[in-house]
Swiss-Prot record:
The gene is PTR_A. Peptide transporter that exploits the inwardly directed proton motive force to facilitate the cellular uptake of di/tripeptides. Residues 1-56 are annotated as: Disordered. Belongs to the major facilitator superfamily. Proton-dependent oligopeptide transporter (POT/PTR) (TC 2.A.17) family. It holds the Pfam family PTR2. This is Peptide transporter PTR_A. The keyword Membrane applies. GO terms for biological process: oligopeptide transport; protein transport. It comes from Candidozyma auris (Yeast). It is found in: Cell membrane.
Length: 589
């Protein structure tokens, strides 16, 4: 233990307590502190006073490694932001899950639809929807980081979001809209909703992390006498895992909306998300006094681009942008800003392979739905199995936290890059399973390689294979999300400077847009009898991408602590929150 500060009173003549008396004495310390009887503290053994003086001081590096880390209390404002995210994700998944049927089928088909764009047309438009939803976060982040701040940006984009859902709902009512009105209304609605969801999504996760007090880890002495480290890292990790849990609880809306779509009509499936989303602006308004609002940076994004440009022009050497080395240039930023931008660029390299992952992930909301439509549904909606993905995540997040990750760490470190690699592997295995399943669908009658596309009497008759067999594909995608998506979300936040949290988060999200763009290009292959080869190609691509990712970036695991140390620095008396990888401390929670 490091040397403690000298006591305020003379303790040289106070005898030491034996180890067996420590716990009782320390309990008395806490009791005396609570009652305010400070004069009796002098009567306690010196060893207990040393522990008392430890309370609140910064730990040494050795103590950081050896002592158990615990979380701070999660602020009320974090819970309020989580409710906003729950409402937004409930609406997003509740709306988008019926989209494939809405776009692909006609009102006379089983499952029924509206726009009758066929599989390849619906898949292309589905990928456009995903592309738009994940390219708009760039705009939302720019607005937040440059002009409005995160809270105000979320409020603005929530209003836009509501307008889009309202248009979708109205144009899906059969008595109100014709075919042309439904098609035009659908396109306008997804553009407006995509703008709204992009603006909310790029800002809500940084906002929830901003609610954590910006303090360094400190030693805390528990009533049991155990010395632990009260670590904001653990608090942020708890918040992010809870945040992702809220996302997937919200995604369970697919059970309700697909059932309404199946048993009533699409308008009923869209009315529920419209009503539920109204919770978001209400919570934002009522919780306004409680939110921590980080001030808007001064042209931070423009300056970061200029700083990066100078580095790229000099072969990625950020020394070219350092004011101390080039005082004559009059750069309007500090040394620390350059280091923050360098770290952000360093982290963004990790995102380069994510478009392949998101391309594979996107199969869950388009081709998987179409595949289920070729199978015997036994009264179930063909798009309801997406709930398996959410249920998998809800169940296995705590299992991974409490058991799987700690068990692996007993034998080897399990850091961010390794987790992302295994996320790619699970996604690849999901495509392998889907390809094998598609092969067996083609082996069954009555239409074999052209389900519902053969003789007229079999137009509405699926091939003889049970929909439940598709379940493992959704399970594998869910496991890949726990490893790749959550870790990527955390990596984007922790490696971003305080003034650029929203922007770097949006860069991570925009990789989904690139994956969707690839999906649009590949959508002509999404038709019978080519689907086995579609899934095979995706499986191989994801496997190769995962292997290349690990080969290129595995050394980032060794540098993670070095990168995270930047957040312990202080500038202009503003403390920045300390961050380490989620994988470092889950076992201590």
């Amino acid at each position: 233990m490091s040397e403690t500060k000298p006591a305020a009173n003379d303790l040289s003549n106070v005898p030491s307590a034996s180890d067996s008396d420590k716990d009782n004495s320390l309990d008395k310390v806490h009791s005396l502190e609570k009652t305010g009887v400070h004069e009796d503290i002098n009567k306690l053994p010196s060893s207990d006073l040393e522990q008392l003086e430890d309370d609140g001081r910064e730990p040494t590096l050795e103590e950081m490694k050896k002592l158990r880390h615990i979380s701070e209390k999660i602020p009320l404002s974090c819970w309020l932001v989580a409710i906003v995210e729950l409402a937004e994700r409930f609406s997003y998944y509740g709306l988008s899950t019926p989209f494939q049927n809405y776009m692909q089928n006609s009102p006379e088909d089983k499952p029924k639809g509206v726009l009758h764009l066929k599989n390849s047309g619906a898949t292309a438009l589905s990928y456009f929807w995903q592309f738009w939803c994940y390219v708009t976060p760039i705009f939302g982040a720019w607005i937040a980081d440059t002009y409005t701040g995160k809270y105000n940006a979320i409020c603005i984009f929530c209003g836009i979001y509501l307008v889009g859902i309202l248009i979708l709902f109205i144009t899906s009512i059969p008595s109100v809209a014709s075919y042309n009105t439904s098609l035009g209304g659908f396109i306008v609605a997804i553009i407006i909703i995509g703008l709204g969801t992009g603006g909310v999504k790029s800002n809500v996760s940084p906002l929830i992390a901003d609610q954590i007090p910006k303090t360094k880890p400190v030693i805390k002495v528990l009533k049991s006498g155990e010395r632990v480290i009260q670590d904001p890292n653990i608090t942020i990790q708890n918040v992010f895992m809870f945040f992702y849990l809220m996302i997937n609880i919200g995604s369970l809306s697919v059970i309700a909306t697909t059932s309404l779509e199946h048993h009533v009509d699409f308008w009923a499936g869209y009315l529920l998300p419209l009503c539920f989303f109204c919770i978001a602006p209400l919570v934002l308004l009522l919780g306004r006094p409680y939110y921590v609002k980080v001030p808007v940076g001064e042209q931070v994004i423009a300056r970061s681009f200029r700083c990066t440009y100078l580095a790229v022009k000099n072969k990625f050497n950020f020394d070219a942008a350092r004011p101390s080395l080039h005082p004559e240039a009059g750069y309007p930023w500090s040394e620390k800003f350059v280091e923050e931008v360098r770290r952000s660029v360093y982290a963004c390299k990790v995102f380069v392979f994510y478009p392949i992952y998101w391309l594979v992930y996107g199969q869950m909301i388009n081709n998987f739905v179409s595949q289920a439509g070729q199978m015997e549904l036994h009264g179930l909606p063909n798009d309801i199995l997406q709930a398996i993905n959410a249920i998998t995540i809800i169940i296995f997040i705590p299992i991974c936290e409490r058991f799987v990750y700690p068990f692996i760490r007993r034998f080897t470190p399990f850091r961010a890059i390794t987790k992302i690699f295994w996320g790619f592997m699970f996604a690849s295995s999901a495509m392998v399973y889907a390809g094998v399943l598609q092969h067996f669908i083609y082996q069954q009658g009555p239409c074999y390689e052209f389900p519902k596309e053969c003789a007229e009497e079999f137009r509405q008759v699926p091939n003889r294979i049970h929909i439940a067999i598709q379940t493992p594909a959704y399970f594998l995608i869910g496991m890949s999300e726990i490893l790749a998506s959550i870790t990527g979300l955390e990596y984007a936040y922790t490696k971003a400077p305080v003034s650029m949290k929203s922007f770097i988060m949006s860069l991570f999200l925009v990789t989904n847009a690139f994956g969707s763009a690839i999906g649009i290009a590949l959508s002509p292959t999404s038709k019978n009898p080519k689907l086995v080869w579609t899934y095979t190609g995706l499986a191989v691509s994801c496997f190769i991408a995962g292997c290349l990712f690990y080969i290129i970036f595995h050394h980032y695991n060794d540098k993670e602590d070095e990168l995270n140390q930047l957040d312990y620095m202080e500038e202009d008396e503003v403390r920045l929150q300390p961050i380490t990888s989620i994988t470092e401390s889950l076992a201590a929670r």
